[in-house]
């Protein structure tokens, strides 16, 4: 297995890179700012400069990677087109390139509540709408996929067990980014994770379960 992580310098993306490196899985990290990436990513990660909005740069970044993990997201800005460009157009470009390269598994970090049009987050330039459109594009692509919809993302880790459920079943809760990274990486080797949307939060009240059981329980 060789992984290409896109959105690798974001808060979730860098944790995905770290998780892959810890497991000795070779990583190519697609980054826009090489100097910044060198500061925050493990030296073991191979850094490739590119941009999901420049399709010609994506294929070279994926290269011989067998799996792609996408954790892109628009930076906070006043650009009303940012979610459309990054969450939809960029992901679409990435899916097309992954398909062309024969990638075996595509993991997308999305969000809870993407199916709720009137969710307050859609006040921010319809961000959830475009994430949902990206999900649907992946599902129709023919690629083997896992779509991970985390709850509110927290930078600090905790020991709370993960709660995993199917699409449009969890509507509140939060989860540490490190746990989201673990879910994404575990999905690569769990047959039960293939072609599923999984919603994830963490909860002190939940019971510990194996990864196999967590993914298997999602219909």
Predicted segments with their positions:
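N-terminal Rossmann NAD(P)H-binding glycine-rich loop of SDR-like oxidoreductase domains
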Residues: 1-25
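NAD(P)H-binding glycine-rich loop region in Rossmannoid oxidoreductase-like domains
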Residues: 4, 8, 29-31, 35-93, ...
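Non-catalytic, hydrophobic alpha-helical segments
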Residues: 12, 68, 138, 148, ...
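Conserved cofactor-binding/catalytic machinery of classical short-chain dehydrogenase/reductase
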Residues: 54, 90, 134, 176-179
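Glycine-/Pro-rich loop/turn segments that contact NAD(P) or position catalytic residues
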Residues: 74-166, 172
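Glycine/proline-rich active-site loop of Rossmann-fold NAD(P)-dependent oxidoreductases
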Residues: 157-162, 187-196
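Substrate-positioning beta->alpha
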Residues: 171-186, 196
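Core catalytic loop region at the nicotinamide-binding pocket of NAD(P)H-dependent oxidoreductases
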Residues: 190-211
């Amino acid at each position: 297995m060789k992984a290409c992580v896109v959105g690798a310098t974001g808060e979730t993306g860098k944790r995905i890179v770290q998780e892959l490196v810890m497991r000795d899985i070779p990583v190519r990290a697609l980054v826009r700012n090489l100097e910044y990436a060198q500061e925050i990513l493990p030296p073991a990660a191979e850094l490739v400069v590119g941009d999901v909005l420049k399709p010609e740069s994506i294929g070279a970044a994926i290269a011989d990677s067998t799996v792609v993990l996408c954790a892109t997201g628009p930076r906070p800005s006043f650009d009303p087109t940012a979610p459309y460009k990054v969450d939809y157009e960029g992901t679409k470009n990435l899916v097309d390139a992954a398909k062309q390269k024969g990638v075996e598994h595509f993991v997308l970090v999305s969000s809870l509540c993407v199916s709720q049009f009137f969710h307050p987050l859609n006040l921010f330039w319809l961000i959830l709408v475009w994430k949902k459109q990206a999900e649907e594009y992946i599902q129709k692509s023919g690629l083997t996929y896992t779509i991970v919809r985390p709850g509110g993302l927290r930078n600090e880790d905790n020991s709370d067990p993960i709660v995993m459920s199917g699409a449009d079943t969890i509507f509140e809760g939060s989860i540490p980014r490190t746990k989201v990274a673990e879910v994404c990486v575990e999905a690569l080797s769990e047959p039960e994770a293939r072609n599923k949307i999984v919603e994830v939060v963490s909860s002190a009240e939940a019971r510990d379960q194996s990864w196999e059981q967590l993914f298997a329980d999602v219909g």
